[in-house]
Amino acid sequence: MSAELGGRTGRQGKLSQWLRGRRPKETGAEEGGREALLLAAAGAGLPLAPAAYPAPGYRCSCDRVGCPTPARHPVSFAWQTQSTTDRAQIERWARHQPQANFITATGMVHDVLDMPLEAGREALERLLAAGIEVGPVAESDDGRLLFFTLTRGTPEDEDEWWPCELDCHPETMDEHPGLRWHCRGSYVLVPPARLPGDQGVHWVRGLEHPLPDPLSLLEILTDSGARYAGEEPDHAGAGWPLRH
């Protein structure tokens, strides 16, 4: 029994060290790996659209003076209708816009549960240790961990949609410093992406992992987020989906 416990503890310790370690910077984006990763994302069902990229001096490639989200927003205001999984279109974008980041529109096929990095790392450890299925996970060097999940409902079927107090949209990001739920009307950067200051967004768990039901992750994510915020988790209150 003690040997089994010791082995489990040792594995969890190694996982913890790996999650907290700095992984090498991705160089594949400059060597052709960028296009392959984007096509893999589209192949997994993530609709993509071109996004801005870093410009010298911590600026954004867009024309907006003092852009509040440099390199983190779509190029087109029509990103929701523009986003696609079409291989040929994504190849054209990737080759004609070699510096562009890409966003994936949420709420059509998938959602993203977006957490502060340390809380997210703890939650990921707990989920894996509990044997809960976890899908693709991306890490942003600006301090967020992104859990990719199935969507709660499709835009075509309004009866399958219900609101949640964690729902986050691009214009309300600052109102959600803790756990954010990117669903319909929102987006996130998809790896590989570059941020100002030589930062980036990269996969921690790849697209080979199936998208899980978001509700299977939510309790541990909420609990870990509350622990890092110094709050008591309220699983029966704010943060849980509310049907009407």
Located regions from the model:
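Catalytic core of tubulin tyrosine ligase-like
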Residues: 147
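Signature for HUH/AEP ssDNA processing cores
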Residues: 2-142, 152, 207-218, 222-244
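DNA replication initiation modules
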Residues: 151-244
